[in-house]
């Protein structure tokens, strides 16, 4: 479950601008602020099922965006490559540049 939550959080970070304000609100509250479906439904005065359906559709949309754009998978690859590169050298200046590259993401 934690792996799924972590993945959805990353996908949300990458693709949230492609979502509607309502989708962003539900996802932020559910995944980032740890609201329950019931709490979200009370705040927006909709059924718990409506919130659940919206979140599930949004998750599917995020996965669809990732299938097409690969932003998250490329990010993961960059992180792994930078870690390998860091292990290959003890040069302080190279480590500083590696950190600068990491900070760009």
UniProtKB/Swiss-Prot annotation:
Instruction: Give the source's domain of life in one word.
Output: Bacteria
InterPro entries membership: RNA_pol_sigma_r3/r4-like, UPF0122, UPF0122_fam_protein, WH-like_DNA-bd_sf
- Pfam families on file: UPF0122
Signal peptide, first to last residue: none
Record function comment: Might take part in the signal recognition particle (SRP) pathway. This is inferred from the conservation of its genetic proximity to ftsY/ffh. May be a regulatory protein.
Family listed: Belongs to the UPF0122 family.
Annotated NCBIfam families = PRK00118.1-4, PRK00118.1-6, YlxM
UniProt xrefs under PANTHER family: UPF0122 PROTEIN CBO2450/CLC_2298 (PTHR40083), UPF0122 PROTEIN YLXM (PTHR40083:SF1)
Q: What is this protein called?
A: UPF0122 protein OB1530
